[in-house]
Amino acid sequence: MDEYHIPVLLDEILSFLVKEKNGIYIDTTFGGGGHSLSLLNKLSNKGRVIAFDKDIDSIKNNNILDARFNLIKTNYRFIKKKIKLFNLNKVSGILADLGISSHQINSPKRGFSIRYNSILDMRMDTYNKINAQHIINNYSYNELYNLLIRFGEVKNAKNISKLILKHRKKKYIKSTFDLIKILNFFYKKKNKFLSKIFQSLRIEVNDEINALKDLLKNSLSILKPGGRIAVISYHSIEDRIVKKFLKTGNFNGIIPYDEYGNNLSPLILLEPRIIFSSKEEKKENNRSRSAILRIAEKKI
């Protein structure tokens, strides 16, 4: 099977997420379609899957031909608006497999990987105007510093930001290898350091944190009582957001209580501990190694 099509934590998703075999489920990150296809196989003839993806490559590569399935090119932050196209207001379950797909990281022209010399792009939706090249060459010192701290928790963010500004005055920074060459003074563990830099840029390019918050808020709104939401994250920055929201229904992580001390959080965590992929899956699928799954159910 092509790595593009290997779904992460599939058994766990099917076990926890599918509560109603006649229900309507949303796959907010279609990717190669592995999760969507498996959900369809789990559901009855009356069940339905609606999938979203902002990457045109994912849309073009879809090979699921099933009357119970619909695929829409859009950012998952618009989930609430888009399901109205199908005259829907509530759904039985929602799946979000966050982060970058194997297809994107392994596509040399997309600029996501430190392995390939390509244009600094990093757009998941290639119709967007802003790419990583624009950010590197146009952001101010403060803007660069803040995104490195917020989205990568990068050490030496001050010096790195200053060095980027210094080099871009001399020459426009075009490619991934241009940037890596500039940064070679800073890293001891090359892959780990550069991955954090690239992660910071990718999150900024795709507005991933704000999109995630929109997704979570809208998911809570359209999830029917007793419906479930499953979120797979790949780094601590997005996982902290997911953890707080699924536990409390807000982003400050404070559980709301009424005057009698009753917990007013709209969701219940089905598994209080983080769900990780098995040792066997980690051997077969590299992407699953950093995967963190959290699942919650909307209170009835």
Curated annotation (Swiss-Prot):
GO biological process, one term: rRNA base methylation
Any one GO MF annotation of this record: rRNA (cytosine-N4-)-methyltransferase activity
Catalysis performed (reactions): cytidine(1402) in 16S rRNA + S-adenosyl-L-methionine = N(4)-methylcytidine(1402) in 16S rRNA + S-adenosyl-L-homocysteine + H(+)
Subcellular localization, as worded in the UniProt entry: Cytoplasm
Superkingdom classification of source: Bacteria
Gene Ontology cellular-component terms listed: cytoplasm
Protein name: Ribosomal RNA small subunit methyltransferase H
Similarity field: Belongs to the methyltransferase superfamily. RsmH family.
